[in-house]
Amino acid sequence: MGSCLSSSGGGGSRRSLHGSPHVPGPGRRKRPPKRRPGSCSSSFDNTEEPLLHRIPGRMFLNGSTDTVSLFSQQGKKGPNQDAMIVWENFGSMEDTVFCGVFDGHGPYGHIVAKRVRDLLPLKLGSHLESYVSPEEVLKEISLNTDDRKISEDLVHISANGESRVYNKDYVKDQDMIQMLIGSIVKAYRFMDKELKMQVDVDCFCSGTTAVTMVKQGQHLVIGNIGDSRAVLGVRNKDNKLVPFQLTEDLKPDVPAEAERIKRCRGRIFALRDEPGVARLWLPNHNSPGLAMARAFGDFCLKDFGLISVPDVSYRRLTEKDEFVVLATDGIWDALTNEEVVKIVAKAPTRSSAGRALVEAAVRNWRWKFPTSKVDDCAVVCLFLDSEPNRLSTASFSKEKHINNGVTEPEPDTASSSTPDSGTGSPELNGVNRIDTLVNLPVYVPTKE
């Protein structure tokens, strides 16, 4: 999303799937060319990424299918640092889909976001396979669904591993749920470790948010770090479509997050020109100020309270649940949860829902934050039923993606316990949105 005025160092690389190293002729050994940190010319980008893009059911460009609509648009701050993905038939499991949006920040945030987009689903799939085979899962479910239940409609797993529970109800298939939850937590942990080891992506002062979701039948498991958000469109008792926020915006001033940050000697305060935006700062340096408490990358802050452990929540879907919207803060800063649900519901076709959200957010940015540049936007709308009356032909064309003029030419390259009132995050009202990651000015905050 934003930019970082300080940058340094880099971190490790993923092994190439194909190709062999160049062998120079006899005589003087040829020195390998230097690679700028954060360069897109990494071995992963050149070999593994094209293979990923040919996987059936994996989508990362503007487009739609019968049940999903994706759309991203570059803002006015530089490269589009937002990324998104939908992977149908994920993990070779029937009626299973993986969705995610990622909001990069810092000088190489666009690269970090796309790297996480590409690798995190692979790590999650690997952990799912290591738990148990699909056949064993079905056998286990058939043996245990009658007597093994989880209390509550929504189960929330906090950073310390303790569970918090909301909306009392009974949920079957405990083994399947625990498998999904455990796999998401492990995948996030290994993803951050891999970023730290990579030499071709500078993640010291660059990183990304992530909100990901696995839908397996009627089971919905969401993992979240940062301030991207997932919102459910659900019918209330009056049959009115209302928003239900599935994730919590993990800002530094959230009490549980602030307690951890202060315990790790990180500082939390807002700048004078954006008093409602709390930031995480190093204890003795005037940079960087990160407007979130959890993120992939940003290793300069990892010893001072920033973590990559996801908040994981579970929900058992019902017939009243109509769609889920995953989006970066370019959407949520400009639109309330209620507005987002209304726009999706009123879209002429499901395939146009993602574009409609982005266009509405851009319009709102121009009057809500007139002194700020429009932010990047990325949105995934997943519809939870299969009604065909609002569907249109799926569209995934490289030409459309590029000719729109709204996104980069990429192919070659918790939870609230009650429905949201639609008022949005109060700390954003009247604030000029600047950057996710900034340097501290010459002044420092006064002591309380």
UniProtKB/Swiss-Prot annotation:
Keywords noted in UniProt: Cell membrane, Hydrolase, Lipoprotein, Magnesium, Manganese, Membrane, Metal-binding, Myristate, Protein phosphatase
Entry protein name: Probable protein phosphatase 2C 74
Bias kind Low complexity: ranges: 412-426
Listed GO MF terms: metal ion binding; phosphoprotein phosphatase activity; protein serine/threonine phosphatase activity
Location in the cell: Cell membrane
InterPro entries registered for this protein in UniProt: PP2C, PPM-type-like_dom_sf, PPM-type_phosphatase-like_dom
SUBUNIT field: Interacts with KIN10.
Cofactor: how and how many bound: Binds 2 magnesium or manganese ions per subunit.
Residue positions bearing lipid (N-myristoyl glycine): 2
EC top class, as a word: hydrolase
Annotated positions binding Mn(2+) 2: 103, 329, 375
One GO term describing the cellular component: plasma membrane
Single biological process term from Gene Ontology: protein dephosphorylation
Skewed-composition ranges (Basic residues): 27-37
Protein family membership: Belongs to the PP2C family.
Pfam families attached to this UniProt entry: PP2C
EC code(s) of this entry: 3.1.3.16
Annotated residues for binding of Mn(2+) 1: 103-104
Biological role stated in the UniProt entry: Acts as a protein phosphatase.
Cofactors (names): Mg(2+); Mn(2+)
Tissue expression summary: Expressed in the whole plant.
Gene3D superfamilies registered for this protein in UniProt: PPM-type phosphatase domain (3.60.40.10)
